[in-house]
Regions:
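Short, hydrophobic beta-strand segments that form beta-sheet elements in well-ordered domains
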Residues: 5-9, 28-37
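A general structural motif
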Residues: 2, 27, 75-76
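Short, conserved clusters of charged catalytic residues that mark active-site
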Residues: 17, 64, 115
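An acidic/histidine-cluster motif and surrounding catalytic segment
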Residues: 14-15, 25-26, 32, 40
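Active-site-proximal specificity loops/subdomain of glycosyltransferases
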Residues: 33-81, 86-112
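A short, amphipathic alpha-helix used for macromolecular contacts
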Residues: 114-121
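A generic secondary-structure signal
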Residues: 20-24, 68-72, 119
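N-proximal low-complexity "stem/linker" segments adjacent to membrane-targeting elements
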Residues: 1-24
């Protein structure tokens, strides 16, 4: 089971697609990873982790942010998700030859998203 979901985000305080697509049970596991100077702009009901000012604006900011997240998470199972993910489900015919929907993909239901995060090991 994924214990924590980290969402690194910059300059998108009013447009958190991934967070808004998650079921409430998973939103409670979210940690938004932000720059300290933007903290006052965010009001989502989740935890916040501010990246060190020393890495803000560097050409390796994303890589250093991922390392910072890794160190913060420690030994738990966690996910790092982009902040603008539409969460979709793919038709199973692509790997089982048995179709489970009319189209090739569709937006995942809240139950499917929750199941995905509960089963990923």
């Amino acid at each position: 089971m994924i214990e924590r979901i980290y969402i690194p985000t910059v300059r998108r305080c009013d447009k958190q697609i991934t967070f808004e697509n998650l079921p409430k049970e998973l939103q409670e596991r979210v940690v938004m990873v932000i720059e300290a100077r933007e903290r006052h702009l965010y009001s989502y009901p989740c935890e916040y982790l501010e990246i060190p000012e020393s890495i803000v604006g560097t050409w390796t900011q994303l890589a250093q942010t991922r390392l910072f997240i890794h160190k913060h998470a420690g030994a738990i199972k966690y996910c790092v998700a982009d902040d603008d993910l539409p969460i979709k489900r793919r038709n199973s015919k692509y790997w089982t030859e048995t179709s489970n929907m009319e189209t090739s993909k569709r937006y995942a239901t809240q139950e499917e998203i929750l199941l995905m995060y509960e089963t990923v090991d």
